[in-house]
């Protein structure tokens, strides 16, 4: 997102050429876009219109055989204009457990965020809050290392995500976890997998 999706055809070709070296290990590629603050651009904060204008030609460049997911961090952008753009191309909107984004129940109460067969979810968390918590616990000697164990219990939230997503999934589902979500990404991933398996099909 550093180039703002402008004049990125050559860098995109180079990037994809490198990624293809991963072969069968390469999964869907995530295009992550930053939050736009209201104070920076009130209209863009509310609508994402400029972002969509730049996103459409970028998606036209993207090879159909290479799976892509698109992540935004403005909740107001999860609306028909963006959803329809992604749906036309069969590209999943990445669903995010992030402090600027809606909880799963609220997310699915609005326009249907499913834009493809693939469900793609990211457990991101709040970087500033988690950094502060981990630093505080480390100073107290409550952690052997900064990111070696869970710092908070996110099981109730993940259980809600699992229930909503499993009932809404149209095909395969992929979940990715960040250390900043609960303090240790591998344990968060294991926890979500276990919770997912307990949700009735």
List each language-model region with its residue ranges:
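Residues lining hydrophobic/aromatic ligand-binding pockets adjacent to catalytic sites
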Residues: 1-201
């Amino acid at each position: 997102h550093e180039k703002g999706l402008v004049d990125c055809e050559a860098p995109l070709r180079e990037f994809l050429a490198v990624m293809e070296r991963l072969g069968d290990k390469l999964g869907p590629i995530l295009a992550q876009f930053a939050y736009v603050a209201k104070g920076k651009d009130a209209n863009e904060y509310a609508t994402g219109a400029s972002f969509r204008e730049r996103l459409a030609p970028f998606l036209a460049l993207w090879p159909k055989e290479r799976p892509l997911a698109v992540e935004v961090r403005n909740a107001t952008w999860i609306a028909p204009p963006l959803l329809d753009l992604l749906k036309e191309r069969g590209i999943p909107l990445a669903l995010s457990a992030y402090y600027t984004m809606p909880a799963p129940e609220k997310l699915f109460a609005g326009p249907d965020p499913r834009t493809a067969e693939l469900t793609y979810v990211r457990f991101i968390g709040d970087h500033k809050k988690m950094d502060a918590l981990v630093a505080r616990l480390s100073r107290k000697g409550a952690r052997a290392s900064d990111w070696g164990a869970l710092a908070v219990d996110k099981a109730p939230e993940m259980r809600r995500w699992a229930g909503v997503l499993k009932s809404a999934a149209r095909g395969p589902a992929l979940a990715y976890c960040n250390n900043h979500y609960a303090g240790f990404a591998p344990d968060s991933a294991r926890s979500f997998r276990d919770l997912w398996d307990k949700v009735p099909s």
